[in-house]
Amino acid sequence: IITGDFNLEYTDPLHARMVAPFADGTPPLADAWDVAHPGVPYPPTFRIYEKEQPGDPELHCDFIFLSEGLCPRLRAVVVDGQTQVSDHQPVIVTLA
């Protein structure tokens, strides 16, 4: 599992690099949101309650990447949009 604030959006080429195959044949990582919610847009995780400038757009820049072996164990991925203790919203995965 690799998780955190990556300071990039889903459309950034670096996100594509995170889920690209490894040169040595190791299976690629998977974005947990994409696994749990295929085709569903990412909810915002940044600038919901704290904006540097009025009108700053909300962004999704917090990701959880899973190894191939963990993907079948993924049960849920949610963004807690109510918490106001940081400028980022928690992204929570449930594995079983």
Segments the model singles out, each with a brief description of its role:
Residues 1:
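Hydrophobic "anchor" residues on beta-strands that sit immediately upstream
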Residues 34-35, 79, 95:
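Active-site donor-binding loop signature of nucleotide-sugar glycosyltransferases
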Residues 72-82, 90:
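Low-complexity, intrinsically disordered Gly/Pro/Thr-rich segments
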Residues 4-6, 89:
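Active-site metal-binding loops of divalent metal-dependent hydrolases
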Residues 86:
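Short glycine/threonine-rich catalytic loop with a Thr-x-Gly-x-Asp
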Residues 64-66, 92-96:
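Short, well-ordered beta-strand micro-motif
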Residues 8-72, 83:
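Active site of divalent-metal-dependent phosphoester/diester hydrolases
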